[in-house]
């Protein structure tokens, strides 16, 4: 395989790309809400995203194939161990309220990946990922907690109408950002997962996503945020959503769609110059 292709594959599969996206959104939060952009919080978001995503993606695989790891998987495991160690170390620098946000997010991620042993009426021995209709909302909640709740709590900022609306905006943005992934996976997801494209169909999923994008832009305008970065990013997201179908390549969503938070970050950074 081409060395550059190997590096790119590792970059995507090791969750470095998604970690950069989460870190970019955290920085966007700090800038738009005029919070102190702390390096420890940004570092924690980056490292913990790598840890959480790789744990969710590879925990079962590592258990089954622990004697036959590929070279890439070995490197991903070592990267995840280092990222986890840095995450734990950086947690000690957080305010107590921010540490609580990390704890709640960590518990949700754990329950998302690991089936619960007891047969609770709701989980019935499953993980949260397997609960019908819940997957995308769990992802939206955790991303909102990490990219909005964490910087707010570490700056000891009280919650008001502005913070609530901003958090709701981020939640909706993440939901729409996940739709191209759900559309891509329509052919593979079991019907019992009840993803939004399975429930609404392709056309109405795109309509719902467009409405969500309209809400995101409206909130930014209402809160008098920088207009060009959010408008450009969400127009690109709308284009990606309209272009999405189950036949699109893996890299379309895993790289290009996932890069949109970084576009927001770059545009907002340029607007500050």
Regions found by a protein language model. Name each.
Residues 36-40, 46, 82-122, 209-252:
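Transmembrane helix-loop-helix
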Residues 21-44, 86-101, 145-168, 218-227, ...:
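Helix-coil boundary and interhelical linker segments in multi-pass alpha-helical membrane proteins
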Residues 19-24, 80-86, 138-150, 206-217, ...:
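Core segments of transmembrane alpha-helices
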Residues 2-18, 58-79, 114-141, 193-195, ...:
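Interhelical loop and helix-boundary elements at the membrane-water interface
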Residues 9-18, 24-26, 39, 43, ...:
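Hydrophobic alpha-helical transmembrane segments of membrane proteins
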Residues 132, 136-180, 186:
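Functional transmembrane core segments of multi-pass inner-membrane proteins
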Residues 37-50, 69-74:
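Loop-to-helix transition at the N-terminal end of transmembrane alpha-helices
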Residues 45-67, 176-197:
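Acidic (Asp/Glu-rich) catalytic motifs at the cytosolic membrane interface
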